[in-house]
């Protein structure tokens, strides 16, 4: 499985040769965040309209158990609120403006719930769901899987990724049908033998021929 994180990709013979004949999946990282605030419904709508194969998004859980789509554990960068996601209720998160930092045109854009995103994307685009776990939210993996199943996202249109191998282990125990990807800063050791990682997401400058062959 190969995912290419970019906004436009020419489908020519030279490209296909470079990637070993595998057709890349065009994945919009945090949605189309060049034109709209990252991890918001406007960014996801733009990715759909531009014909992407998948959207990569990040999920966390509020203090009252709602799975929301946002990248940083601290909400200050995108909302101005200096607080952790897991310390706030969903009602508190839903009051935050997640768009004004990007442009005044997106003022009052909210942090979406995973359920809202699934309602938007179902039947229109696939997903790469990155789970961002916390010791404060042990139910995050199970609730994420429950929602994906409820809205018809399966191994044909969804992968689950994480920087936490423990999270991937939990996902495989809950839902072995989902392809799981381990996000690595560096490829060190026999990581490719890890049983609960079906593929790896590695920064391009660290990829070697030996890594690909392994």
Model-assigned labels for residue ranges:
Residues 1-214:
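Phosphate-group recognition and catalysis centered on beta-loop-alpha active-site segments
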């Amino acid at each position: 499985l190969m995912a290419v994180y970019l906004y436009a990709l020419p489908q020519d013979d030279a490209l296909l040769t470079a990637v070993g004949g595998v057709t890349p999946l065009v994945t919009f990282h945090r949605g189309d965040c060049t034109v709209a605030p990252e991890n918001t419904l406007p960014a996801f709508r733009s990715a759909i309209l531009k014909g992407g194969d998948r959207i990569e998004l990040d999920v966390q859980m509020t203090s009252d158990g709602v799975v929301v789509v946002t990248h940083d554990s601290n909400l200050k960068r995108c909302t101005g609120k200096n607080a952790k996601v897991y310390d706030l209720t969903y009602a508190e998160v839903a009051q935050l403006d997640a768009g004004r930092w990007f442009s005044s045109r997106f003022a009052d854009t909210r942090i979406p719930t995973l359920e809202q995103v699934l309602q938007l994307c179902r039947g229109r685009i696939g997903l790469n769901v990155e789970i961002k776990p916390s010791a404060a939210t042990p139910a995050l993996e199970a609730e994420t899987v429950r929602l994906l199943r409820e809205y018809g996202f399966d191994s044909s249109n969804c992968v689950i990724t994480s920087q936490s191998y423990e999270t991937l282990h939990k996902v495989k125990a809950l839902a072995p049908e989902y392809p799981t990807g381990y996000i690595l800063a560096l490829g060190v050791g026999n990581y490719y033998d890890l049983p609960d990682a079906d593929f790896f997401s590695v920064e391009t400058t660290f990829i070697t021929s030996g890594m690909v062959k392994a």
